[in-house]
């Protein structure tokens, strides 16, 4: 009998040890078949990947992250691991669209530059609508962030679908509609000629009114809220010329109804100059960051992006909505009437770190730097794992700091340091540890039953 008890206790101890040793399975990147999210007339080469954290906020916000040329959804998930980690703690959903069939995004065809016209922009918007419906997302908190071709697509999404997107961050992008210059609707996107064409070379110039009219023509009759935007560009960029920064300023200040003269200029960190423009209610709605001597390799800073979107904390309103309640629609995926600007308090500016960066919670508003940490140097941990040190949105050179050395069209993104420690459960089954525990306990019960039937 004593031997039997010893055997049972040993089995129980072993089972307990196995339960303790079970690996924690978290959320993972999942592909969604186009038959589930798509619609007739959308490009067949566009794929959808989605990351849904284990713990979602009530009415979770959504961040779209279009990749660079030669990129894909899986790669962008790794490159933006610091933002994914924040999604785990703040409970927002991330969509990683993929256009590997074309290598780069179509931000120049008449299909993509036409509200409801289909194309790549229409495909991404369809992904957003699917996610809003399936997960009960917040239609007033949909954002986009991307670098190079992903930055170009971000600006196209904001210009063509202002009723869907609240804000965006464009790294090394170009003005909405610029990519249409010389675009061949027959051959489509991905053509190397586009990268050496007039827009890529910074040779497309228009007045602010011309740029604004172009954007407004993509959604005729729309009078609602226009998304806010951050644009980052290196002064030594030879892939997508820095000259596009001046055109971007002319375009978006006109679209947003602002003067081309900035509300202010500062230096949030050494070598980076920020110009910012405030709306009538005092909230910063457009920012242009120039990085001295930087080429096509602007660093991705997940914590700063999250702060700009107001996603560095769980729940709540978009920061612009909170600062200017009368100027921003309450949140409908069809846009709403918009409302006049100028309502709300003095606001506060949403800078991206460094000295100042207002939170803009409506009221007197003081500046409160949105992001700490320099370019690509922040490590953030969340339930999905620890993000590696930041890399750079890079092109052909690569090298240190997690940068990806892939070349191709000269439009690839340096990694988010995925080799330096992202422990996110990418592509693994998120199996329930409770089910595994039940299996072990059942096995233990079977062994105990057999022991009882043995003669003593």
From Swiss-Prot:
Free-text note on domains in this protein's UniProt record: Comprises a single domain but contains five nucleophilic elbows. Each nucleophilic elbow forms a local active site with varied substrate specificities and affinities, thus possessing one or more enzyme activities.
Positions of transmembrane segments: 433-449
Under Gene Ontology molecular function, one entry of this record is:
carboxylic ester hydrolase activity
Q: Where is this region: Disordered?
A: 382-426
Keywords noted in UniProt: Cell membrane, Hydrolase, Membrane, Serine esterase, Signal, Transmembrane, Transmembrane helix
Tell me the organism: Sorangium cellulosum (strain So ce56) (Polyangium cellulosum (strain So ce56))
Return the EC number. 3.1.1.-
Superkingdom is Bacteria
Protein name, please? Multifunctional esterase
Q: Where is the active site?
A: 148 (nucleophile), 149 (nucleophile), 386 (nucleophile), 412 (nucleophile), 419 (nucleophile)
Concerning its family, UniProt says: Belongs to the carbohydrate esterase 1 (CE1) family.
Give me the stretches of Low complexity compositional bias.
Answer: 392-410
Report the InterPro entries cross-referenced here. Answer: AB_hydrolase_fold, Esterase_phb, MYXO-CTERM, Plant_Biomass_Hydrol_Est
């Amino acid at each position: 009998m004593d031997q039997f008890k010893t055997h049972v206790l040993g089995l129980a101890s072993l089972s307990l040890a196995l339960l303790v040793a079970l690996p924690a399975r978290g959320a993972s990147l999942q592909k969604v078949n186009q038959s589930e999210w798509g619609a007739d007339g959308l490009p067949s080469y566009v794929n959808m990947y989605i990351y849904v954290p284990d713990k979602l906020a009530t009415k979770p916000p959504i961040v779209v992250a279009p990749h660079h040329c030669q990129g894909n959804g899986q790669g962008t998930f790794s490159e933006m691991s610091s933002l994914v980690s924040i999604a785990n703690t703040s409970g927002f959903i991330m969509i990683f669209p993929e256009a590997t069939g074309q290598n780069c995004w179509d931000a120049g065809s008449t299909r993509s530059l036409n509200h409801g016209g289909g194309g790549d922009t229409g495909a991404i918007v369809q992904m957003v609508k699917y996610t809003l419906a399936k997960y009960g997302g917040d239609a007033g908190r949909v954002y986009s962030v991307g670098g190079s071709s992903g930055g170009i697509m971000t600006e196209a999404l904001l210009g063509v679908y202002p009723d869907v997107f609240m804000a965006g961050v464009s790294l090394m992008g170009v003005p909405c509609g610029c990519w249409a210059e010389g675009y061949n609707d027959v051959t489509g996107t991905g053509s190397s000629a586009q990268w050496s064409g007039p827009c890529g070379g910074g040779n497309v110039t228009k007045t602010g009114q011309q740029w604004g009219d172009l954007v407004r023509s993509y959604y005729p009759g729309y009078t609602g809220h226009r998304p806010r935007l951050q644009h980052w560009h290196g002064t030594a960029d030879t892939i997508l010329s820095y000259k596009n920064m001046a055109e971007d300023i002319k375009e978006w200040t006109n679209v947003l109804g602002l003067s081309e003269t900035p509300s202010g200029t500062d230096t949030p960190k050494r070598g980076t100059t920020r110009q910012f423009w405030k709306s009538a209610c005092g909230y910063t709605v457009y920012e242009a960051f120039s990085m001295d001597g930087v080429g096509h390799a602007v660093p991705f800073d997940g914590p700063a992006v999250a702060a700009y979107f107001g996603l560095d904390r769980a729940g709540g309103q978009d920061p612009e909505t909170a600062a200017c309640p009368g100027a921003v629609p309450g949140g409908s995926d069809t846009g709403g009437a918009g409302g006049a600007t100028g309502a709300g308090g003095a606001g506060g500016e949403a800078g991206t770190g460094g000295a100042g960066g207002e939170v803009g919670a409506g009221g007197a508003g003081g500046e409160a730097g949105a992001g700490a940490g320099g370019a690509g140097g922040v490590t953030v941990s969340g339930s999905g794992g620890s993000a590696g040190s930041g890399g750079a949105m890079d092109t052909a050179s690569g090298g240190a700091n997690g940068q990806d050395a892939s070349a191709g069209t000269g439009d690839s993104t340096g990694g988010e340091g995925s080799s330096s420690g992202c422990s996110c459960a990418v592509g693994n089954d998120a199996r329930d540890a409770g089910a595994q525990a039940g299996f072990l306990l059942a096995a233990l019960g079977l062994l105990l039953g057999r022991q009882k039937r043995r003669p003593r």
